Each structure stands twice: as structure tokens, then as C-alpha cells.
Amino acid sequence: MDLRPCAPAESRKRTEYSDRQECQKGKDMIRKAVFQDEEQIAVVYEKARAYMAEHGNPNQWGRTFPPRELTHEDIEKGILYVLEEQGEVHGAFMFEIGEDPTYHVISEGAWKSDEPYGVIHRVASDGKVHGLMKETVAFCSSQISHLRMDTHEKNLTMQHQLLRNGFEYCGVILTHDHTPRLAYEKL
């Protein structure tokens, strides 16, 4: 896949694909999600939940995470991105530059840097397009080189992908509901 970051449109409405022409190179692209993507994103999340359950991780997202309200809110904030191929959404992730409150306290280790960072959450794929994590990391790294992520201890696929894509294990953080997550960082 040949993807490049989308330049933000100043007066973009979240109901239009206003950055499609700027971002597309070849047939694949990463772009900001818009409200029309919500149904396809819900399908991607459903497939990701099924994959996690089949691979020994049924509890990280359960049966309903992320809720549609969170997807809608992320689109509204302009922090939800999709991987699109030939007009179909095959992956999604949340990316935001700035502090994540759940990363303020880390145990069983330490962060490598206190410099500003971008955080990636809720990476999901429908399994039809390979290389989503690589493209996600490349896209986010083009925005800010310092990245942080976390994952469930039973999400072995994501742990492998994080290490494969240059992240280092740093310790354990607690989510908003106080469940532990393995924390990773890429400088």
C-alpha cells in the first residue's frame, strides 16, 4: 500500500469526503473518518471483536466496545481515521496528539521520554487488507515521531504488531475503569 497523510481541510464538515483527492495515491488511503463511515466502521469493529475472541482475548472489547456513541464523538472531534480501499472501509484507529490521562501513572516500568506524544487507540481491521498496523504507525509517525499505545495482556496479536513496528514495552497503565493494560512507546 502506498499511503500518505491527509492534509487537514480548514473548513471540513465531517459529512463530506473533502480530503479524498488530496490523500489518495493508488487505490488505498488513510483519511479522517466521516459520519457516512459509521456503519462500515461498526462492521470493522464487529470483525475485530470476533477475531479477538477467537484468539483468546474475548474480554478486551467484549461484545459492544467501542460503542457507536464513541465512534460518533471521535468523528466529531476529527480523531478517528479509516483505511479505505476502493471505496470500502477496512480498518479504523483513533489518533490524537496530546496527553492521555491514563498514561500519567505507569507501574512495573517507566516511559522512555516525557516529550509530547501522539496516542493511538482502537486499532481495528476487518481482516481483508493486510498491513494496517504498519500503515497506521507510518501515518501517525509522519505527524509526530513519539507515539504511545497500550493493549490487553491477552491481545497477543497486538503485542506482536507493536514490537514488530518499533514499539518498546514500558510497563503497565490502568484504563479509566482501572483495568491494567500493557504500555508501549515508540520514539
Where are these regions (language model features)?
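Conserved beta-strand in the GNAT
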Residues: 82, 88-98
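Conserved catalytic-core motifs of GNAT/GCN5-like acyltransferases
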Residues: 150, 168-182
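Conserved acetyl-CoA-binding loop-helix of GNAT-fold acetyltransferases
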Residues: 125-142, 160-164
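Conserved acyl-donor/pantetheine-binding loop and adjacent beta-alpha core of acyl/acetyltransferases
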Residues: 94-128
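A short beta-loop-alpha structural element at the N-terminal edge
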Residues: 29-43
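A short helix-loop-beta-strand connector motif used in the catalytic cores of GNAT acetyltransferases and
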Residues: 70-82, 99-101
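Conserved GNAT-fold acetyl-CoA-binding loop/helix
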Residues: 49-69
